[in-house]
């Protein structure tokens, strides 16, 4: 079955580029006053992350923030997330800034309902297959994974496919993540450790707190909530 086993990698370090199309996102989030603020919004915000992991566990964190021109305004969500996943135990410890507070979420891995497709794409030199995922039946994601990397992870809380996710698109968030560099030799696995600081919580309790904050924000609050589902 694995005639060319050396091409299957059990550990990896990946650099991801995250792009948020800010004007498109804000047009949906704040349609009532978008025309007033659109000229002060950047067209897009580009930030960078690293994923380090093996078949047992992984860490995902930001390495470079988006650079926004001084005369522009953009307050990203999820930019400070640090996601530690334990695939063996099916657990996650995620540091997640929410409003003025930082949560430390200790919970089971995010439940994602996947549908595999026959579509393919090459990303960072790897042949990838497309899958469509649904998180909490509220947020659809499009993922491209390669079975040459044996880790079932991806950017943010994405996991559960038969290979590593190298490309991710979330239409409702007007955001995408794509691998720009993949290293499979000398992977620094000793650095895979969960965060320890933050308000200890579960995913459900954190979302309940967020709902309480956003309950009077109307349509904007409902749309904003989706940014914290991933």
Predicted regions and their residues:
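Sec/Tat signal peptide C-region and signal peptidase I cleavage site
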Residues: 2-5
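Extended soluble regions of mature proteins
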Residues: 7-230
